[in-house]
Amino acid sequence: MEYINSKVSGANAVVSKGDAGDSSIIISPQHLKEVCRQLKDGEHEFQVLQVIMGTDFLAENLIEVSYILASFTKNSELILKLRLPRGDENNLPKVDSVVEIWKAADFQERECYDMIGVEFLGHPDLQRILCPYDWQGFPLRKDYVTPEKYLDMVINPISKMNIEDREFGAKHAHIKGASTSVDNYKVDPPATVSETETV
């Protein structure tokens, strides 16, 4: 934290200790690129961007973007976070892209845009990556409402499986633990040690 604040004026880095898991460092969004450059090129050598993810804090009207960085030379890991106003479909939260710092950010920023609606300024090709290009809304936002249909295809969020998945499950019901009923199809239980020893 002190390192970031000493290298980037206005970064306002503070340590955040969660209820569980690792602590993180929260910074001012407008200084993201400067901070990331220092973390990658400076003495801590965070050469690897492992994950970019977004979290919707609906009650607080915030979107939190997290960057998990790793330094293999220093054997260390860092969780960097920033918080953005939640906005809406016509006024998405915005933050600079870090693709020019870590190429691995390319698809991860696209996924974060697609799923939670964060606009990464300066991204070379910011478009949906999991949903169809004309999909409406952002599926991981807590107030997202799944449409009943897409291009005349029925979407069934209750079962989480389409009919082809159910039929496949019924056809392969001879597998230990699977149900023979299409309506009650369930995932196979994990194998025990004794079952895998003879394979």
Regions found by a protein language model. Name each.
Residues M1-V199:
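Terminal low-complexity/charged segments
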